[in-house]
């Protein structure tokens, strides 16, 4: 990239940065960002929510987390796909989870939490 980038002027660099910044998978549209105020998604990922009997996502889905062998790593998956699958688990439309684990977990998440988790895992 260096041979190509060395001839760019400051405006071209800014334009390229803006272009690539918009390509971030799962970015939140600023118009809808108010829907997510007060959601601590990192806490749900790392610690879960004891009050709702919600286990931490990272306990099973983090790379080398040591979760059940059938548990997929979510890092880098497309946000739209993750959101659709979490919604399907929550609504009982997807039922290939052993012992109903994901149906139970996803049913406890709000739609906004599902969206934020999908965005969070897609952006890693």
Regions found by a protein language model. Name each.
Residues 27, 51, 67, 93-96:
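Alpha-solenoid repeat scaffolds
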Residues 6-28, 80, 105-124:
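C-terminal capping alpha-helices of c-type cytochrome domains
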Residues 1-8, 58, 62-91, 103, ...:
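Gly/Gly-Pro-rich "capping" loops immediately C-terminal to redox-active cysteine motifs
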Residues 16, 20, 54-64, 117:
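The canonical Cys-X-X-Cys-His
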């Amino acid at each position: 990239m260096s041979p190509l980038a060395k001839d760019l002027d400051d405006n071209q660099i800014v334009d390229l940065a803006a272009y690539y910044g918009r390509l971030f998978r799962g970015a939140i549209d600023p118009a809808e960002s108010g829907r997510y105020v007060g959601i601590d998604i990192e806490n749900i990922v790392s610690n879960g929510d004891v009050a709702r009997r919600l286990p931490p996502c990272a306990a099973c889905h983090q790379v080398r987390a040591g979760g059940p062998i059938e548990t997929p790593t979510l890092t880098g998956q497309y946000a739209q796909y993750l959101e659709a699958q979490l919604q399907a688990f929550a609504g009982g439309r997807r039922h290939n989870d052993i012992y109903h684990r994901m149906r139970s977990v996803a049913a406890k998440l709000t739609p906004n939490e599902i969206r934020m988790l999908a965005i969070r895992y897609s952006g890693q």
